[in-house]
Amino acid sequence: MSYAVKEIFLTLQGEGAHAGRASVFCRFAGCNLWSGREADRQDATCKFCDTDFVGTDGTLGGRYASAVELADTIAAQWTASNDNRYVVLTGGEPLLQVDDALIDALHARGFEIGVETNGTIAAPDGLDWICVSPKGGSELVLRRGHELKLVYPQALAAPETFEGLAFERFSLQPMDGPEVAENTARAIDYCLRHPQWRLSVQTHKSLGIR
């Protein structure tokens, strides 16, 4: 199959359990919860989405004809030693496109593979790190993984709803926007009262990196 990719770039992971880790980000175009167009935001399941995943016009974006071509492009962005190679497959919703062929091609190039997903689509085998970020009002299909990262607060997505699921780590991330200070204070308070949850902040935004 071919892959529609918005952008590919090397950066430090800015949030969640792998914050601070060198990572190649591969952002896939398209999502099943929102078109990505502002005109449709009010009809989106996640109206707070802050990511541009529309089209293929970003850095190294395009339609890749094969898993090998895409994996080679990702590998070319890794400028350090061959140790600790890490790729984050994100979106949009990456599981609309990620398949066995791409997973095999990335593993063959020495990458540990992380995926950031809204959890509404079953994940293929072979992913090394599954981070699910549930969206209120959507059906959660992926009910186990390595990390559940909840943007907080969210209507229809209270943290206690997810505490019994089979995840190794639970992260609470303050919702960005005009009320970020209040949301951060609320998230801190929640984590203090419910230590199963760890605070996740978007460090890449404060550092000015992608």
From Swiss-Prot:
The UniProt record lists the keyword Metal-binding: yes
Biological processes, Gene Ontology terms? queuosine biosynthetic process
Span of the signal peptide? none
Q: Which organism is it from?
A: Bradyrhizobium diazoefficiens (strain JCM 10833 / BCRC 13528 / IAM 13628 / NBRC 14792 / USDA 110)
Q: How does it assemble?
A: Homodimer.
SUPFAM superfamilies registered for this protein in UniProt: Radical SAM enzymes
**Which free-text remark accompanies the cofactor?**
Binds 1 [4Fe-4S] cluster. The cluster is coordinated with 3 cysteines and an exchangeable S-adenosyl-L-methionine.
Its required cofactor(s), as named, are: [4Fe-4S] cluster; S-adenosyl-L-methionine; Mg(2+)
Protein name as it appears in the record: 7-carboxy-7-deazaguanine synthase
